[in-house]
Amino acid sequence: MLALRLARGSHPLVLLRRLCVALAAAGTGFLMLSTIGHAAGHPSAADESLLRLLWCTAPLAATAQFAVSTARTDPAARLQRGMTAAGLGPLRLTLLATVSTTLTCVLGVLVALLVFLRLRGDLGGPSAVRFDADLLGVGHPLPLVGALMLLATVPLTAAVATAVALRPRHEAGDAETEGSPRIAPPSGLPWGIAMAAAGLAIEAYTSRGTGAHGGLLPLPGRLISSPPGVLAGWALSTFGLVLAGPGLVHLCGRLLCAGRPGALRLLSGRVLQEESHRLGRPLGVLCAVGSAAYAAMKVYEASPSRPFGLLTAIGAAVVLACVTASALTAALESRSARARTTAALRRLGASASVLYRAAALRALALVIVLAPLTWTVAEMATLPLVH
């Protein structure tokens, strides 16, 4: 009940973020329901249905990440003193955020279920003519219990991810707010680069001859056969970019502070170094997804006879929207965390234009470093497949 009351009294922007989480959960739930419909309509094609279900893990992970990012920026999670005075400790705050995330995702998957049943014609009306019957399993009984159990994985995954990310951390220096030591610089940059390089090498080795056999990377709307080594290489490269994200953001800050920086460069660089842990992972995921999307477009441009399917478009839209929204939410969280520092700078005489120019310089530095790296990884990933 407390989660519902807080949702009713939330700011419109907070409600908008939760609505976006519900829409992401609805898109992921619709993809999962389509796998159930395909399995019901093609009982003999179990391998194909299983592959379609495995492809749903990408939007499921993106939805969970977006749900965690939204829970981090929830005002109730940041007002710890007031909540503690009201009798809600750190553990109960985590439970409250988990319940709110679960309710939001449950709302989304219920909407997906209603839309799916309406398109199939199971709610007392004709089935949708514009949709392929194979995607919905029209004319075949839908196992409702199995569909509900599969849909339950969306709010369950988001709830577990939120509980793990927002769990109370008891540290020795919790009482020291101002005299706490600095956070150590990220150490995952060399490991991330090594993983990305290893993934590209695995893909180059295992993709020999796949072009001649038509074994390009399949997506769940059209193609089924898939070279496992190519998928493993892509996955390893993706994890490498995600792991290297905090180190890359910290490197951007170091580059801005290199030489004899002025006040603007020094301020921008220090902020990037301090916020590398908070911004690095969402930006790393965004770079990985952007690299994979660019590589997939390049691969399928080389094979025009294999167009993207409807499920591929829905899944790609969910993943891209979630990772972009997660990166923007992380930037908003970083801005909220620096509220005291910004207020101190304003009291010292820093104008608003200086702060805006510092933010623009940080964004420009991130684009200059991350965009070429993302493009390079995508190009190297597609070279063995299109040549």
Which residue stretches match the model-derived regions?
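Transmembrane-helix bundle segments that line or gate the permeation/cavity pathway
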Residues: 20-38, 53-76, 80-84, 90-207
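Hydrophobic multi-pass inner-membrane translocation pores used for secretion
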Residues: 1-28, 44-46, 57-70, 183-387
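Short, hydrophobic transmembrane alpha-helix segments
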Residues: 36-46
